[in-house]
Amino acid sequence: MSAFDGVENQMNGPDSSPRLSQDPREPRSLLSSSCFPITLKFVDVCYRVKIHGMSNDSCNIKKLLGLKQKPSDETRSTEERTILSGVTGMISPGEFMAVLGPSGSGKSTLLNAVAGRLHGSNLTGKILINDGKITKQTLKRTGFVAQDDLLYPHLTVRETLVFVALLRLPRSLTRDVKLRAAESVISELGLTKCENTVVGNTFIRGISGGERKRVSIAHELLINPSLLVLDEPTSGLDATAALRLVQTLAGLAHGKGKTVVTSIHQPSSRVFQMFDTVLLLSEGKCLFVGKGRDAMAYFESVGFSPAFPMNPADFLLDLANGVCQTDGVTEREKPNVRQTLVTAYDTLLAPQVKTCIEVSHFPQDNARFVKTRVNGGGITTCIATWFSQLCILLHRLLKERRHESFDLLRIFQVVAASILCGLMWWHSDYRDVHDRLGLLFFISIFWGVLPSFNAVFTFPQERAIFTRERASGMYTLSSYFMAHVLGSLSMELVLPASFLTFTYWMVYLRPGIVPFLLTLSVLLLYVLASQGLGLALGAAIMDAKKASTIVTVTMLAFVLTGGYYVNKVPSGMVWMKYVSTTFYCYRLLVAIQYGSGEEILRMLGCDSKGKQGASAATSAGCRFVEEEVIGDVGMWTSVGVLFLMFFGYRVLAYLALRRIKH
């Protein structure tokens, strides 16, 4: 029995020849067939990872108790774990392959390997596309759908796919053609009824799980991939939704000549019948690869058959788990079943599979077509220009973030704070220096903590989507980052400007349009600097919980050294106030209200040297105002430092994002 019955006929048959469209710029011709056929081969694929651990389990307990450790306690043992071991298979254009196996069998690792997403010395073996190595050009024709649906929840289905089309389709296509391509994919995958519904997620009500999975597939179909790899696309779907989704995938393979590979955990019998080729994994080793219709006959030939009629997929998964019910009651234990099947595969099936792969060759005519189509004529595969990427990403960001930036609770938070400040300091007297200094410092605290804390979640929350889109080459890092910078300028400044507008005139701070505009400018610059701190910490740590803790401690240090709470900062901590955004904002707000300092000293009854004969306490207060409130940092120096922080923190955030591998 041949593992790949009829492979040679399919490779040389009429279905494998490329189908050229009359006008490659039309969306229907762009999506109706593969630009070139892809034959995927993988031979003896192995993947190993090294696990580092302590040789003595008591080492961690000793560290917690503060006990001394022996040199032997610090010796680390390195264990190498094999995820994949000698996996071999092949799939031709127009075929639908399913990778079966229990959890932890290596299905996702194999799919990442064949999709070109695993690199390094840990991966060995051959992975060939059209008898050649994986290249950047072939990766551009490979679509990868992850198990999790990584989509923006506030965008509608249409908006999601339109933005993808504008970013991923070649720049040679006009905008109208790209929009029609998005509409074509929406219609093809049956998303028309929900195209104007938000995608949603666990917390936001939106489309169903099956529809969300089809949106993820449409995300990749827009580039018209010749090879489509899907990691457990039916996970979380009911039987009917899973069947409809698999029917769609089978239609892409059989009707459009695409090469489709998917992993699936536990398919129904109806779903199993749609697979052309099945590959069964168990603990990283292959137990079967071949036509799905031949699987039961093969296992019967090696001594394993079900005692009663059952779903073939369930029987295969039982075998992969090392369990076989021979009479409906007893079970053979796992080691015997698994080892027997591995030995049978290595002896009977593996040689036939490798021979079939060796004798099948990709037609030279098709190879020349691929080279011409990708490198020469036809539609160029260049992505959008940098400026176009910036505009599209900025538009998408504004649509997605408007719900977060102008959330009702967030607006209530700012309005409530503004009203409380206005009532607490209602028409305060210009000579009530201590009261007004308290208000100015409260403003510095509130608009330092709030923007930094909100910004710290930006990049950690988008990490998964950002990594996937960068891996698919949708845009450059610089355009993505610049879109976030510009988006924050337009959205994050509305609330602080509204807060100050109400509070300033309710409190009746220094009258005049010029002092108000100066105060507003300082506050907005301070908000952007504080936001930059949050972006930098979030990008550097990339863990929302840890980053929020770090930014809270950092802002606490900035507040304590801001020049209001402590009369005399310890000499060892003086440096902290000079890196504090709160320190410079507070200095500027005081300077705008009371000038260079002579006026505020005069109001307190201090002479030019900061002395007063009334009492020692009052004299100490004068010295505090003179040394800490007025200080030795000028207005222009403070403005310059805030601008430096505004740019510096964002540069650090950009450099931190460059570390992320995709």
Swiss-Prot record:
Membrane-spanning parts: 374-394, 406-426, 437-457, 489-509, 522-542, 547-567, 629-649
One of the record's GO cellular component terms: plasma membrane
Main location: membrane
Pfam family, one: ABC2_membrane_7
Record entry for activity regulation: ADP and vanadate (ABC transporters inhibitor) inhibit the ATP-dependent abscisic acid (ABA) uptake.
Residues covered by region (Disordered): 1-30
Record's subcellular location: Cell membrane
Residues noted as binding ATP in the record, renumbered to the chain: 101-108
GO molecular function: ABC-type transporter activity; ATP binding; ATP hydrolysis activity; ATPase-coupled transmembrane transporter activity; efflux transmembrane transporter activity
SUPFAM superfamilies referenced in this protein's UniProt entry, alphabetically: P-loop containing nucleoside triphosphate hydrolases
Catalytic activity: abscisate(in) + ATP + H2O = abscisate(out) + ADP + phosphate + H(+)
One GO-annotated biological process of the protein: transmembrane transport
Protein name stated in the entry: ABC transporter G family member 25
Highest classification ranks of the organism: Eukaryota, Viridiplantae, Streptophyta, Embryophyta, Tracheophyta
Gene name of this polypeptide: ABCG25
